[in-house]
Amino acid sequence: MAHWPEDVGIIGIEMIFPSLYVDQAELETYDEVSPGKYTMGLGQDKMGVCTDREDINSLCLTAVDKLMERNNIDYNDIGWLEVGTETILDKVKSVKTVLMQLFEESGNTDVEGIDTINACYRGTAALFNALIWIESSSWDGRYAIVVAADIAIYAKECSPTGGAGALLMLIGANAPIVIDRGVRASHMKHAYDFYKPDLMSEYPVVDGKLSVQCYLSALDHCYPRFCSKTEKYLKRCGKENTKIDLDYFDAFVFHSPYCKLVQKSVARLVLNDFIQYPEKYQDLQQLRNLKFEDTYFDRDIEKIFMDKSKQLFEKKTKPSLMLANQVGNMYTTSLYGGLVSLLISEDIGELAGKCICMFSYGSGFAASMFSLHISTDSSPGSTLSRLVTNLTHIKPQVQQRVKLSPGEFENIMEIREQNHHKAPYTPVASPNTLFPGTWYLESIDSMHRRKYKRV
């Protein structure tokens, strides 16, 4: 190919989440913790819940099916499909191979891509791999599908930080949401902040304090690198003296284990901005010699920059947290659920032309920052209009979910814990509470082979 494909990015998005939820305020009362521990301390209002009828395969089957139907895409037009998930059912067989049964009727088996892991970063890794394919000599002009999906389940003491979801991105050229080339910044290190060494359990091992420090440290490394790379790229494009700071971006979207951490992350961006441009903050000159490593658990510093960043958070980040607040921690899905929340938070005319900064983090750890540009054409029938229109069902669907009592939620979690990886097994939950068109687990035979049906 003589030149790069133009405007490679997101052409369509499909987002699914559980039809059941538990109220976090009711969970506070049930767990006999102080009022506000989950709702104020974590910033969470509701949490999506999967019964034993739903697993990672069923979530992804549902999402792919709906993406293809809603966007009227022929399965023969897909040349790449990659799944980012840490919700592992099999150490050998990938989720991607399960999804290939949806392609059988079309006869299309020429689909590259496979599963990728590393905690909550893997959806971003799958996205980057799809971009590499489209910008390579192997690209044959077809679309790529990126799947970011997980079921987040914790032991009882950490259960309020769970959730579940699956998000698919249809990737191609001439997209209404363009992923900026040449400006990604990454930071990767070894840490035992969050990991899953017990393959017979759905529960992670978590060092909560270290996990927060790793997340914020990764942000501190990625943001200045990203700004520097963006400035250099724009200079090469003839845009001299373009200042890349907090004012350059129209929105900041973060990986969201819980909403309060995202609010703290915006405060870290302001801290970074202060370190880079101290003259902008005349009232903070006494802090000019501040060192990042001394600030992660300094509550006085945190409060100063939380207060300083409040307006920025409200304007440029809070609109991206609707699904995180209502569905919970979706692991690798959460960053892109934030993008969806942003896209459905305002009129399409207000979205047009915006530049969005994205921060992806996965424990262990791996992190990247990158940016998106939204098309300036928001006219009826435009690719941007079609993308956003195909997301209008999400807000009503959030309201249509069925509420569980905390006791019912606890019972569902106990059933999952007792029967995880059991074979043979027939799920006990009713499929009648699932949204229409949902794929669900019908049974597991003695050889651990899973059979699925659609509502």
From Swiss-Prot:
Pfam families according to UniProt: HMG_CoA_synt_C, HMG_CoA_synt_N
Keywords: Lipid biosynthesis, Lipid metabolism, Steroid biosynthesis, Steroid metabolism, Sterol biosynthesis, Sterol metabolism, Transferase
Sequence positions that bind (3S)-3-hydroxy-3-methylglutaryl-CoA: C120, T161, S211, H255, K264, N329, S363
Active site positions: E86, C120, H255
Gene3D superfamilies: 3.40.47.10
Gene Ontology terms, MF aspect: hydroxymethylglutaryl-CoA synthase activity
GO biological process, alphabetically ordered: acetyl-CoA metabolic process; farnesyl diphosphate biosynthetic process, mevalonate pathway; sterol biosynthetic process
Stored NCBIfam families: HMG-CoA-S_euk
Family label: Belongs to the thiolase-like superfamily. HMG-CoA synthase family.
Name of the protein described by the UniProt record: Hydroxymethylglutaryl-CoA synthase 2
EC numbers: 2.3.3.10
Function: This enzyme condenses acetyl-CoA with acetoacetyl-CoA to form HMG-CoA, which is the substrate for HMG-CoA reductase.
Biochemical pathway: Metabolic intermediate biosynthesis; (R)-mevalonate biosynthesis; (R)-mevalonate from acetyl-CoA: step 2/3
